[in-house]
Curated annotation (Swiss-Prot):
<dbReference type="InterPro" id="IPR044004">
    <property type="entry name" value="TSP1_spondin_dom"/>
</dbReference>
<feature type="signal peptide">
    <location>
        <begin position="1"/>
        <end position="36"/>
    </location>
</feature>
<feature type="glycosylation site" description="N-linked (GlcNAc...) asparagine">
    <location>
        <position position="475"/>
    </location>
</feature>
<dbReference type="GO" id="GO:0003094">
    <property type="term" value="P:glomerular filtration"/>
</dbReference>
<dbReference type="GO" id="GO:0008593">
    <property type="term" value="P:regulation of Notch signaling pathway"/>
</dbReference>
<keyword id="KW-1003">Cell membrane</keyword>
<dbReference type="InterPro" id="IPR056991">
    <property type="entry name" value="TSP1_TSH7A-B_C"/>
</dbReference>
<feature type="domain" description="TSP type-1 15">
    <location>
        <begin position="1193"/>
        <end position="1247"/>
    </location>
</feature>
<feature type="disulfide bond">
    <location>
        <begin position="767"/>
        <end position="780"/>
    </location>
</feature>
<feature type="glycosylation site" description="N-linked (GlcNAc...) asparagine">
    <location>
        <position position="223"/>
    </location>
</feature>
<dbReference type="Pfam" id="PF19028">
    <property type="entry name" value="TSP1_spondin"/>
</dbReference>
<feature type="disulfide bond">
    <location>
        <begin position="729"/>
        <end position="792"/>
    </location>
</feature>
<dbReference type="Pfam" id="PF23308">
    <property type="entry name" value="TSP1_TSH7A-B_C"/>
</dbReference>
<dbReference type="GO" id="GO:0005886">
    <property type="term" value="C:plasma membrane"/>
</dbReference>
<feature type="disulfide bond">
    <location>
        <begin position="491"/>
        <end position="519"/>
    </location>
</feature>
<feature type="compositionally biased region" description="Basic and acidic residues">
    <location>
        <begin position="259"/>
        <end position="272"/>
    </location>
</feature>
<feature type="disulfide bond">
    <location>
        <begin position="1033"/>
        <end position="1046"/>
    </location>
</feature>
Length: 1686
C-alpha cells in the first residue's frame, strides 16, 4: 500500500500487478507444501511423552531430595505404544534431584520483586494492531518486571518451586497507560517595547511566558522573545560607543588605622603595648588639642563661640555635678548591656569601575572620560557571624512519674547568643531544642491515673416518655413501666494501691472531682432506660352461693347465733401482698345454726308397700354428712342433725294415671327475704298417661302439678369486715436489730442489708353492713376478723453523700493584658447519693465562687533604641584620591545600641525581646556629614490639623539650618521645598449588608417547652428567634473600615420562627370488641385512629395497618365459657291428642314447651338473653309428636342421654340410650324396647377432640405504663373434629397433653426522645478579619432516639456572622528599576517599600493602601516572612550585553486531564526566563532561555480549543484558546486546526457571490445559487419570502423580501454550494415566470373538480314524504348523566 501510494501514474498500476503475481506464487507454494506434508505424514511417527513431576521426596529438608515422573512412548495420533517404537537415545529422564521444602523454609525464602519496566505500547507487542492516528486519552501499554525466589539473608536466587510452596508467584505484567504527548503551551506575546535607542539602530522586543511545560514527549517550547530592529532617527554627532560599568562592592574591610593597631598589638609584648598605648594616647591628645585650636581659629559665627563658652563653663562645674554626670553615664552604659552582643566595627568597601564597548569588550577608562566617574568606596559594617554558647544540660523531665499509658514528657536545653550576626553574617541557629523523655532511676512512682466516676442513678421517670397528647400528662401519679433515669459523670483521681477501699459511697471516702479533661477513657452513659414495676391489682373470683346457717365457731356452740357465709378467692398475687385485697367473706345472721348436716345424695327406687307390684310405696334417701363448707365428713358428726325421712311415692298400676318425676327446683326469685320481698322456688311435673276410667288412680288437677317453696329466707342484711390501709412501720424496740432476729421476727423474709430493724404496723378493722355503713363489731363473725397488727421491716437510713469540694479552678491568667473585668474562680461538689428513709439531708450549697486575687500586669517586653552614634566616614587615606572628596564631610555610616526593656521600664535579657518583642530595630543606617556647600534642612513637621472634614487644606513645613540660610542655591524652593500642602481628608461612609442570613437563633436562655411541660424531649428550641446578616462599612474610596464608622453594631436583625415539633396524634383506645367466639378461644380488638400526622420533627406514628394506613390495632385472645349461655326448657305442656279417643283419652298427640337462652351463673341460669348467644345446634326441641299411652299400656320414662361413642370413631361402634318403665302394662300388652342404638358416625354423633393454640397476643402493658416489660398471652382451644370449638372439659376428660406455655414476658420498646446537649458557647470567629467570618456553636446527641421517640434534629450546629473587621496587612510595593549609581550599567540596587493595605479578606479584593498607623498593632511581616527586605542588589545590563529576564511568576497549577477527568499524573506549574538584548549585533551571544517546573497540589483542568474570527476577504484569524479564556500558543491539536485562508479558482466575480470555506463559489445570506449544468455558479438570486399581513399593517399586499435565514450550503453535490430548483420559478429580473401562473390556474381547477365530485358522492337521495301517524310513539329522551356508556 505504501509503495502504491507513493508511485504516481503508471507506477501505481505496475505495482498492483506485481502484488497479484506475488500472491499467486504464495498460493502455489502453500499448496505444494501441504502436498509435501501429506506425503511425509503417511508414515506413522512415535514420540516420547512425559507426565508431571511428582512430589519431592527425601529424608531431610533442603537439597538432596528426588522426584520422578512417568515417561511413555506414544503415537502421534495419541495412543500409547511399546517403548521400543521410540528412539531410546531421545528418551527423557524420569528422575531428578530436587529441593524438599519444609514449613520452616518460609522464614528463609521469599519472592523478590523487581521494579516495573518502562510502559511499552500494546501495538508494539501486537504487530497487527495499528496505532491510533490521533491520541485522545493515552495509549494502552504493558509493563513487566522480574520476580524470583531468593534466600532472604543473602539474596541468593533459589528455585521458584520453594516460594511457590508457600505463596503463588506474583504477577509479572500489568497494564499501564502511556499518556498522550503534551506540547509546550506559552502565552500570547506582550506588546512591542519601545526602541532600545533614541537614535540610531536599536531593538524592539516582545515577550511571552511558559504556561505548561512539554510533557510525555511533547514538542519543546518555542522562542519566548521576538526581536525586531528599529531606528527612531539619525543621531546628531558621534554616537557614544563606550559606557561606564561598575562592579559589585567588595568585602567590608577594617580601616587601615584599626588594622595597623590590631596588627601591632599582636606582635608587641604586654609592657611594650602598654607603653605604646600611652604614647598613642598622648599623641592623640596633642592632635586633638591642635585640631581644637585650629577649629577655634576657624570659627566665625557668633553662635559657635557661644556654644564654646558653654562647654568651657561645663568643664568648670563643681565636683558634685561631675559626680552626678559620671553616675548617669555609668547607668547608661549598664542599660546599654545589649551592646556586648553586637561588636559593630565600621569599615569600608570598594568597587571596580571599568569602561566597556557596546560590543561587550573592555576598553581603557580613558575612553569614558566624558562621563563622571562614580564613587568607588563606601562605609560598611564588618561582617560577623552569629556565635552561640554550648548547649546547656538537659532540663529535668517534665514528667516525674511513670505513665502506664506510655505517654512521655519533655525536656529542653538552651544555648545563649554570644555574638549576634552583623553586616550580613550567618544567622543564629536554634537556641532551644526539646525531646521526649521518661524519668530515669529507681523508685519512680507511677503517674496519677484518673477515672470516670458516676453518681447514683436518679429515680426512674415515666413522664418523660409521654407523648404530647397523652391524657396521663395531667395526672402523673402511679405511672409505671419503662422510664428513663439519669446520672452525673465526673472525673476523679484513681485511688492508689496502698489506699483503703475508696469505692464505697461513704461521705469521707468519696473522691474529690477534678477537671474532666484529665480522664482519657470514654465517659459512662448518663442516661439509661429503667423499669418501675407496675402494681398488680388484686383479682378475686365471683361470690360463691350462700352456705347453710352455721355456727361462728363449731367448737363453741353455746350461742344460738349463726351466720350464712359466702366466699370468694384471690386469683393472683397482688403487689404488696393480700392485705390490699377487698373482703373475701360476707355473712348474714341466721337462726338455728348447725355445723354439720345431712346431704341428700339421691332417692332410691320407689318400693310399693306390702310387697305389691304397684301402688303406694316409699323412697329411701341416700345421705352423706357434710360440714358448712359442703365437704364430706364422718357420719358421726351429723348425729345431732335431723336425718331426712323416706319419701312417699307411688308405682303406677296399669290403669293408674302416670305422672312424670318432679323437675329440679328453679332458681330462687330473690337472694334474700325481707318485708317486701320473699324468695320462692318452683318445680313442676306433667301427666304422662291418663287413668282408665274408674279403675285406676285419678290424675290430679293442674294445681297439683306444681309446687312452690320458700328460699333464701335469710334477711337482706349482709355484713363483712372492712380493713383500712396498713399504717407506717414503727420501730419495735423489743426486737434486736440483728439479721437473724429480723428473720425470726418476720417469717419468710430473707436477710437483706437494706433492712436494719423490725417494726410494727397497724390498721383499722371495722364491721360494715352493705349499703349502710359501719355497725358494731358483734354483727360480724369474730372468728373471721382480720388481724390489726403485723410485724414489718424498717429500711436502713441512707444519708446524703457528696464529694469533697474540687480544687479551686485556676484564675484565667497570672496577669492582666487589659480590661477591667474581674476574673473569678470556682469550685463544686457533687451529690453522689440522695438521702432516703429519714437520712441526713444534702447540703444546700454545692457551688462556690470567688474573685481572683488582683493580678499584676503581664510582663511584656520591648526594644529600646539609644541615640545614633556619630557618622563615621571612610578613612581619608582611601577617599583622598577620589575627585571632589573632602576630608570632613561626605556619606558615612552610623550605629546605635539596642537594649531590651520590660514594659514597666525594667531591664530584661535580650533573649526575652527576641522571643516576645518582634523584630529587632535596625542597628546601622547611612548618614551624611554635610559639606560646606551642602544645603541642610530640618525634618518635616507634622501636618497641621483640619478645622473640618472635606474643608480646606493642611500643611507641613521645614526650615534651612546654619549657613544654608544664606546660600542662594539652598533658597531654590523647587529643589528644596520648605512646605507641602494637601487637601483635608473627606471621610464619607456608607453601610451595606453582606453575606447570607444566619441560622434562626433563639435569644439566650429562651427554651420553650411543649404544652407547658418541661419533660424529656420537650427541650427542643422553638418559637420566635432572630437571624442576622453582617453589615459592612466602606469609606468614600470604597475601602473597608470599622463598622462603628457607619454607626452600626455590625448586624441586621430579622425575626424568624423555629417551628415547634408536633408529635403524631392518635385517638384514645376504643372499647374492646366482643370476643369473636361465644365458645372457646377467640380474639378481641381495640384500635386507635390517626388524628394528625407528625411534622417539624415530631414523634413518628407507630406502624399503621397495611390496609388502612390510618388505624392502629391491638389484638388479644379471649376465652368464652361455653357454658355461660345455656338453653333452658320449661316442662312439657299437656298432651294435645290429635286423634282423640273420647273414651280412653289416648293416642297420637303433641307436646310443646318453651325453650329460652339464659345466662348461666354460679347459682344456675338466671336472666334470659338473646337466642343467638346460645349454640343453635344444642337447642332442645320445643315440640314433640308422640303417642299418648292408653290405659293399661306400658309407660316409659323419657329417653336418657346417649352414651358416648368409643374413640376413635368407628362405623362398627354404636351408642345407645335407654328408658325405664314407669307403669307396667296389662297382661295382654308388652313394653316396647327400653334401649335404642345408633351407629357412631364421625362428625355426626362421634367426634375427635384436639387442642388448638392461638397466636400470641400483642404485648400487653398496664394502663399506667407507656413501655417496658409486659406480657403476652395465648390460649388453648378445644376443637372438635368438625372444627367447632367446644368446652375445654371435652379435651381435659380425654387427658390430652398440654405442652404449650400460655404466658410469656415481652418488651415494648420505649419511645425515647432524642436528647441533645445544651448549645456550646459561641466559638471564636473563624476569620480574624474580613467578610467571611462566622461564629459557630454546637450541640451533641446525648441520647439517640429509640422506638417511636422523637428523632434528633438535623441542626447540630448554628452559625452567625462575625462583625466585619477590615483586614490589614503589610505588603511590598513593586521593585524599582535597577539603578547603578554613577554609571550606566553594572552592579546596582533596586528598592521597594512596605506599606499598609486593607482588604476584605476574600482574596478577590486587591486591597487599598492606607495609613501605616492602622497596621501599627501588626507584626511587620509580609506573607508570613518576618525578614523584611527592602533593597537588593541587581545588575543593569550594558548596551552590548544580552541577558535573561527575571523569573516570571509561577503559572497556575494545572492537572493532566482530558474532558475534566484526571488522568492521575499529578499537577505541575512552571515559570520561565526570556532573553533580552539591546544591540542587534549581539543577538548571537545570547544565552538560552530557561524554564523550570515543579509539582503542585489542587490543580485545575484546562481544555484547549481552536477559535476563529470572521472572514475578511479570503483570510481570517485562527487561534488557540484555553478554557479560562486565555489565548495561548500550543495546547490545541494541529491536526484539527481550521483553515485561515481560502481561495476559489476561478475567482468568484458574480454579484453577491463569495468564496466558501470549501473553496467553492457560493452566495451571500438571503440569496440562492443558480448553477450551470457543469456545476459552476451562474448567478445569485434573492430568496422569496411570503409576508402575511397583520392587523396593524396599513398595507395588505404581498411583499417579497430577503430571507433572514437562507438555505445553508450542503456538501451533498460536489461542485455546488447548495440545493437549487431544477425549474427556476423566477426570471433574471426576480419576477415570476409565465409558466408558474399556468400551473397555479390548473391546480385551482383540479381542486374545484375534486370538491364537487366529493359532494355529489356523499349526498343522500331525498326520500318521499309520508303522513305521520297519530298513534306513533314518541322517542324517549334520555338525559346524559356522564356515564361513558351513554
Amino acid at each position: 500500500m505504501g509503495l502504491a501510494s507513493r508511485a504516481p501514474g503508471k507506477g501505481g498500476t505496475s505495482a498492483g500487478a506485481l502484488a497479484s503475481l506475488f500472491r499467486v506464487a504464495l498460493l502455489f507454494f502453500g499448496l505444494w507444501d501441504v502436498q509435501t506434508q501429506t506425503v511425509a505424514n503417511t508414515r506413522p511417527t512415535y514420540i516420547w511423552q512425559t507426565g508431571p513431576w511428582g512430589r519431592c521426596m527425601g529424608s531431610e529438608c533442603g537439597p538432596g531430595g528426588s522426584q520422578s515422573r512417568a515417561v511413555w512412548c506414544a503415537h502421534s495420533e495419541g495412543w500409547t505404544t511399546l517403548h521400543t517404537n521410540c528412539q531410546q537415545s531421545e528418551r527423557p529422564s524420569n528422575q531428578q534431584s530436587c529441593f524438599r521444602v519444609c514449613d520452616w523454609h518460609k522464614e528463609l525464602y521469599d519472592w523478590q520483586l523487581g521494579a516495573w519496566n518502562q510502559c511499552v505500547p500494546v501495538s508494539m507487542r501486537n504487530a497487527g494492531v495499528p496505532r491510533p492516528a490521533v491520541c485522545t486519552r493515552g495509549e494502552e501499554g504493558i509493563q513487566t518486571r522480574e520476580v524470583g525466589c531468593v534466600h532472604k539473608s543473602d539474596g541468593v536466587p533459589a528455585e521458584d518451586a520453594i516460594c511457590e510452596y508457600f505463596e503463588p508467584k506474583p504477577r509479572l505484567e500489568q497494564a499501564c497507560l502511556i499518556p498522550c504527548p503534551r506540547d509546550c503551551v506559552v502565552s500570547e506575546f506582550s506588546p512591542w517595547t519601545s526602541c532600545s535607542k533614541s537614535c540610531g539602530m536599536g531593538l524592539q522586543n516582545r515577550l511571552r511566558s511558559v504556561l505548561a511545560p512539554p510533557l510525555f514527549g511533547g514538542s519543546a517550547c518555542p522562542n519566548l522573545t521576538e526581536f525586531r530592529t528599529c531606528q527612531p532617527g539619525k543621531c546628531e554627532g558621534v554616537e557614544s560607543l563606550h559606557s561606564l560599568r561598575v562592579g559589585p562592592w567588595g568585602q567590608c574591610m577594617a580601616s587601615p588605622i584599626r588594622q595597623a593597631r590590631d596588627t601591632g598589638e599582636a606582635r608587641v609584648p604586654k609592657a611594650e603595648r602598654k607603653a605604646k598605648r600611652d604614647r598613642q594616647a598622648r599623641q592623640e591628645r596633642q592632635g586633638k588639642r591642635r585640631k581644637n585650636k585650629e577649629k577655634k581659629e576657624l570659627r566665625e559665627s557668633k553662635g559657635e563661640r557661644v556654644r564654646e563658652r558653654v562647654k568651657e563653663k561645663k568643664r568648670m562645674r563643681d565636683p558634685e555635678t561631675r559626680e552626678l554626670i559620671k553616675k548617669k553615664r555609668t547607668r547608661n552604659r549598664q542599660n546599654r548591656q545589649g551592646l556586648k552582643f553586637w561588636d559593630l566595627q565600621v569599615g569600608y568597601q570598594t568597587r571596580e569601575v571599568t569602561c566597556v564597548h557596546r560590543s561587550g569588550s573592555t576598553a581603557s577608562i580613558s575612553q569614558c572620560t566624558q562621563q563622571t566617574l562614580p564613587v568607588t568606596y563606601q562605609a560598611c559594617v564588618i561582617s560577623k557571624d552569629c556565635e552561640v554558647s554550648e548547649w546547656s544540660d538537659w532540663s529535668v523531665c517534665s514528667k516525674e512519674c511513670y505513665d502506664l499509658n506510655g505517654r512521655k514528657g519533655q525536656r529542653t536545653r538552651t544555648r545563649q547568643v554570644q555574638q549576634f550576626p552583623v553586616g550580613g553574617g550567618a544567622e543564629c541557629p536554634e537556641l532551644e531544642e526539646s525531646e521526649p523523655c521518661s524519668p530515669q532511676g529507681e523508685g519512680i512512682p507511677p503517674c496519677v491515673v484518673y477515672n470516670w466516676r458516676s453518681t447514683e442513678w436518679s429515680d426512674c421517670r415515666v413522664d418523660v416518655l409521654l407523648s404530647q397528647q397523652d391524657r396521663r400528662r395531667s395526672n402523673q401519679t402511679g405511672l409505671c413501666g419503662g422510664g428513663v433515669q439519669t446520672r452525673e459523670v465526673y472525673c476523679v483521681q484513681a485511688p492508689s494501691e496502698t489506699s483503703s477501699n475508696l469505692g464505697s459511697l461513704k461521705s469521707k471516702d468519696a473522691l474529690r472531682p477534678v477537671n474532666s479533661d484529665l480522664c482519657l477513657g470514654v465517659p459512662h452513659n448518663t442516661t439509661q432506660l429503667c423499669h418501675i414495676p407496675c402494681p398488680v391489682e388484686c383479682e378475686v373470683s365471683a361470690w360463691s352461693a350462700w352456705g347453710p346457717c352455721t355456727f361462728e365457731n363449731c367448737q363453741d356452740q353455746s350461742t344460738k347465733k349463726g351466720f350464712k357465709l359466702r366466699k370468694r378467692k384471690i386469683m393472683n398475687e397482688p403487689t404488696g401482698g393480700t392485705g390490699n385485697c377487698p373482703h373475701l367473706t360476707e355473712a348474714i345472721p341466721c337462726e338455728e345454726p348447725s355445723c354439720y348436716d345431712w346431704l341428700l345424695v339421691k332417692l332410691e327406687e320407689c318400693v310399693p308397700d306390702n310387697d305389691k307390684v304397684c301402688g303406694p310405696g316409699t323412697q329411701n334417701p341416700q345421705v352423706q354428712c357434710i360440714n358448712s363448707d359442703g365437704e364430706f365428713v364422718d357420719r358421726q358428726l351429723c348425729r345431732d342433725a335431723i336425718l331426712p325421712m323416706p319419701v312417699l311415692c307411688e308405682v303406677s298400676c296399669p290403669k293408674d294415671c302416670v305422672l312424670s318425676p318432679w323437675t329440679s327446683w328453679s332458681l330462687c326469685s330473690n337472694t334474700c327475704s325481707g318485708k317486701n320481698s320473699e324468695g320462692k322456688q318452683t318445680r313442676a311435673r306433667s301427666i304422662l298417661a291418663y287413668n282408665a276410667g274408674d279403675g285406676g288412680v285419678q290424675c290430679p288437677n293442674s294445681s297439683a302439678l306444681q309446687e312452690v317453696r320458700s328460699c333464701n329466707d335469710h334477711p337482706c342484711t349482709v355484713y363483712h369486715w372492712q380493713t383500712g390501709p396498713w399504717g407506717q412501720c414503727i420501730e419495735d424496740t423489743s426486737v434486736p436489730s440483728a439479721n437473724s432476729s429480723i428473720s425470726r421476727a418476720v417469717p419468710g423474709t430473707a436477710v437483706n442489708d437494706a433492712f436494719c430493724s423490725v417494726g410494727m404496723q397497724t390498721r383499722k378493722v371495722i364491721c360494715v353492713r352493705v349499703n349502710v355503713g359501719q355497725v358494731p363489731p358483734k354483727k360480724c363473725p369474730e372468728s373471721l376478723r382480720p388481724e390489726t397488727v403485723r410485724p414489718c421491716l424498717l429500711p436502713c437510713k441512707r444519708d446524703c453523700v457528696v464529694t469533697p469540694y474540687s480544687d479551686w479552678t485556676p484564675c484565667p491568667s497570672i496577669c492582666q493584658t487589659g480590661g477591667s473585668v474581674k476574673k473569678k474562680q470556682s469550685r463544686k461538689r457533687i451529690i453522689i447519693q440522695l438521702p432516703a428513709n429519714g437520712g441526713q439531708d444534702c447540703p444546700e450549697v454545692l457551688f462556690q465562687e470567688k474573685d481572683c486575687d488582683a493580678s499584676s500586669v503581664c510582663p511584656g517586653y520591648r526594644w529600646k533604641t539609644h541615640k545614633w552614634r556619630r557618622c563615621q566616614l571612610v578613612p581619608w587615606s582611601i577617599r583622598q584620591d577620589s575627585p571632589g572628596a573632602q576630608e570632613t564631610c561626605g556619606p558615612g555610616l552610623q550605629a546605635r545600641a539596642v537594649s531590651c526593656k520590660k514594659l514597666d521600664s525594667g531591664p530584661a535579657d535580650v533573649a526575652a525581646c527576641l522571643k516576645f518583642a518582634g523584630p529587632m530595630p535596625q542597628l546601622t543606617q547611612s548618614c551624611q556629614l554635610p559639606c560646606q556647600d551642602d544645603c541642610q534642612l530640618t525634618a518635616w513637621s507634622k501636618f497641621s490639623t483640619c478645622a473640618a472634614d472635606c474643608v480646606g487644606v493642611r500643611t507641613r513645613k521645614r526650615t534651612l539650618v546654619g549657613k544654608s540660610k544664606k546660600r542662594e542655591q539652598c533658597k531654590n524652593t523647587q529643589m528644596y521645598p520648605l512646605s507641602e500642602t494637601q487637601y483635608c481628608p473627606c471621610n464619607k461612609y456608607n453601610a451595606q449588608p453582606v453575606g447570607n442570613w444566619s441560622d434562626c437563633i433563639l435569644p439566650e436562655g429562651r427554651v420553650e417547652g411543649l404544652l407547658g411541660m418541661k419533660v424529656q424531649g420537650d427541650i427542643k428550641e422553638c418559637g420566635q428567634g432572630y437571624r442576622y446578616q453582617a453589615m459592612v462599612c466602606y469609606d468614600q474610596d470604597n475601602r473597608l473600615v470599622e463598622t462603628s464608622r457607619c454607626n452600626s453594631h455590625g448586624y441586621i436583625e430579622e425575626a424568624c420562627i423555629i417551628p415547634c415539633p408536633s408529635d403524631c396524634k392518635l385517638s384514645e383506645w376504643s372499647n374492646w370488641s366482643r370476643c369473636s367466639k361465644s365458645c372457646g378461644s377467640g380474639v378481641k380488638v381495640r384500635s386507635k385512629w390517626l388524628r394528625e400526622k407528625p411534622y417539624n420533627g415530631g414523634r413518628p406514628c407507630p406502624k399503621l395497618d397495611h390496609v388502612n394506613q390510618a388505624q392502629v390495632y391491638e389484638v388479644v385472645p379471649c376465652l368464652s365459657d361455653c357454658s355461660q349461655y345455656v338453653w333452658v326448657a320449661e316442662p312439657w305442656s299437656v298432651w294435645k291428642v290429635s286423634n282423640v279417643d273420647l273414651k280412653e283419652n289416648c293416642g297420637e298427640g303433641v307436646q310443646t314447651r318453651k325453650v329460652r337462652c339464659m345466662q348461666n351463673t354460679v347459682d344456675g341460669p338466671s336472666d334470659p338473653v338473646e337466642d343467638y348467644l346460645c349454640d343453635p345446634e344444642e337447642m332442645p326441641l320445643g315440640a314433640r309428636e308422640s303417642k299418648l299411652p292408653c290405659p293399661e299400656d306400658c309407660v316409659l320414662t323419657d329417653w336418657g342421654s346417649w352414651s358416648r361413642c368409643p374413640l376413635p370413631c368407628n362405623v362398627n361402634s354404636t351408642r345407645q340410650r335407654s328408658a325405664s318403665p314407669i307403669r307396667q302394662p296389662s297382661e295382654r300388652k308388652q313394653c316396647p324396647s327400653t334401649t335404642e342404638k345408633e351407629i357412631c358416625t364421625l362428625n355426626s354423633n362421634c367426634f375427635h377432640y384436639s387442642y388448638n393454640i392461638t397466636d400470641w397476643s400483642t404485648c400487653q402493658l398496664s394502663e399506667r405504663a407507656v413501655c417496658g416489660v409486659g406480657f403476652k398471652t395465648r390460649m388453648l382451644d378445644c376443637v372438635r373434629s368438625d372444627s367447632k370449638s367446644v368446652d375445654l372439659k371435652f379435651c381435659e376428660e380425654l387427658g390430652l397433653e398440654k405442652k404449650w406455655q400460655m404466658n410469656a414476658s415481652c418488651v415494648v420498646e420505649c419511645p425515647v426522645n432524642c436528647q441533645l446537649s445544651d448549645w456550646s458557647s459561641w466559638s471564636e470567629c473563624s476569620h480574624t478579619c474580613g467578610l467571611a467570618g462566622k461564629l459557630w456553636r454546637r450541640r451533641t446527641v446525648i441520647q439517640a432516639s429509640q422506638g417511636d421517640g422523637r428523632p434528633c434534629s438535623s441542626q447540630l450546629e448554628q452559625w452567625k456572622p462575625c462583625p466585619v473587621k477590615p483586614c490589614f496587612s503589610w505588603r511590598y510595593s513593586v521593585w524599582s528599576p535597577c539603578k547603578s549609581e554613577g554609571a550606566r550599567c553594572g552592579e546596582g540596587l533596586r528598592f521597594r517599600n512596605v506599606s499598609c493595605f486593607v482588604s476584605d479578606g476574600s482574596g478577590k479584593d486587591a486591597g487599598s493602601m492606607v495609613d501605616e498607623e492602622l497596621c501599627g498593632d501588626l507584626e511587620q511581616t509580609v506573607d508570613g516572612d518576618k525578614q523584611i527586605i527592602l533593597q537588593e542588589s541587581c545588575t543593569v545590563p550594558c548596551p552590548g550585553e544580552c541577558y535573561l529576564t527575571d523569573w516570571t511568576m509561577w503559572s497556575p497549577c494545572q492537572l493532566s486531564c482530558i474532558g475534566g477527568d484526571d488522568l492521575g499524573f499529578g499537577s505541575v506549574q512552571v515559570r520561565s526566563r526570556a532573553v533580552l538584548a539591546q544591540e542587534p549585533e549581539n543577538l548571537l551571544q545570547c544565552p538560552e532561555q530557561e524554564w523550570e517546573a515543579r509539582p503542585c497540589t489542587e490543580g485545575q483542568c484546562y481544555d484547549y480549543k481552536w477559535m476563529t474570527g470572521a472572514w475578511r476577504g479570503s483570510s481570517r484569524q485562527v487561534w488557540c484558546q484555553r478554557s479560562d479564556g486565555l489565548n495561548v500558543t500550543g495546547g490545541c491539536q494541529s491536526t484539527t486546526e481550521p483553515v485561515s485562508d481560502r481561495s476559489c479558482d476561478p475567482a468568484c466575480d458574480k454579484p453577491r457571490s463569495i468564496c466558501t470555506e470549501a473553496g467553492i463559489c457560493g452566495c451571500e445570506e438571503g440569496y440562492t445559487e443558480v448553477m450551470t449544468s457543469d456545476g459552476v455558479l451562474d448567478q445569485c438570486t434573492v430568496i422569496p419570502v411570503l409576508e402575511i399581513p397583520t392587523a396593524g399593517d396599513s398595507k395588505a399586499d404581498v411583499k417579497t423580501i430577503r430571507a433572514l435565514n437562507p438555505t445553508e450550503p450542503t456538501a451533498n453535490m460536489p461542485g455546488r454550494a447548495g440545493r437549487t430548483w431544477f425549474l427556476q420559478p423566477f426570471g433574471p429580473d426576480g419576477k415570476l415566470k409565465t409558466w408558474v401562473y399556468g400551473v397555479a390556474a390548473g391546480a385551482f381547477v383540479l381542486l374545484v373538480f375534486i370538491v364537487s365530485m366529493t359532494y355529489l358522492a356523499c349526498k343522500k337521495p331525498k326520500k318521499p314524504q309520508r303522513r305521520q301517524m297519530n298513534n306513533r310513539l314518541k322517542p324517549l329522551t334520555l338525559a346524559y348523566d356522564g356515564d361513558a356508556d351513554m
